[in-house]
Amino acid sequence: MNENVVIKVDNLTKDFGDQKGIFDISFSIKKGEMVGFVGTNGSGKSTTIRCILGFIKPNKGESYVYGKESWSHSSSFIKEIGYVPGEIAFPDLNTGTDFLKSQAEFLKLKDFSHANRLIKILTLDPSANLKRMSKGMKQKTALVAALMHDPDILIMDEPTTGLDPLMRINFMDVVKAEHNKGKTILMSSQSFEELENSCDKVIFLLNGRIVSIASIDEIKNRPEQDFKIEFTNHEDYEAFKALDYTIIRDQPQYHQVTVSIIKGRVNDLMKDLKIYHLKFISEVKYTLERHFKKIANIKEEN
């Protein structure tokens, strides 16, 4: 295995029956990369993560961390990973402080300085009773526990789900700071925007299978630009459609088209549009969400 590859998943399959599970999943994550998982509920994000951590034995295929097979050798690398689960269930302890101390003992951690910095950044009160903690406080406590020993790998399963917008930003600022320090990060999320603003690449899962692995740089720097144009009358709409433009979406009921052009040809488009009566023209940004909908063949809303 390439020494620069930290996590490798090779034809991983875990079949729960009734077409539920993951099937022939393959990808790799290099040192220092931040990779996102996105997909509908039940698409296999959590199952893949649990296989990587050695919590679930696959029916077929393997996953590796630092070149060590997950199911057989997870004990040799698990302490080098910071993990934030999708469903946080604390042990029967009184406070967040008690939980963090128990984690420190498990990790044989004696220096609490990094944990204290994280507590301050996240404005967390660890003395709060675990059972009375809000969703946000539980997420913060879990993140501190995952990062307190300064691991090289961080794996998080939808860590910001249920957080209010301000807390989500605060949480992701900490994650981005870890990425900037060179940490290798795998994070699943329901938020396309969150992944687009933080990841190097994103893996799309649908019905337990990978349908696309997208580079964020390629999405942001694609050579085409898309424009939505609405005409005031049917005649102009039909006349424009007869021109040599790539129409990627046609909505005749609104006299509206979306065209894709090569960057640098905007002036040509504007010249061609001068003779028509327009209601509006606007650029349609190509986002991670649009890419996923295109791959998954999901129709965009108006």
Regions found by a protein language model. Name each.
Residues M1-T13, I298-N302:
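ABC-family P-loop ATPase nucleotide-binding domain
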Residues V5-I7, K14-L206, S212:
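ABC transporter nucleotide-binding domains
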Residues S70, S74, F112, I216, ...:
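Residues at or immediately preceding the N-termini of alpha-helices
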Residues H73, I219, H291, I295:
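Residues that scaffold the ATP/ADP-binding catalytic core of kinase and kinase-like folds
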Residues L100, A115, I216, N267, ...:
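Generic structural marker for isolated residues within well-ordered, non-membrane alpha-helices
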Residues M172-S260:
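ABC transporter nucleotide-binding domain
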Residues Q225-N302:
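Short, charged/small-residue-rich alpha-helical element at the C-terminal edge
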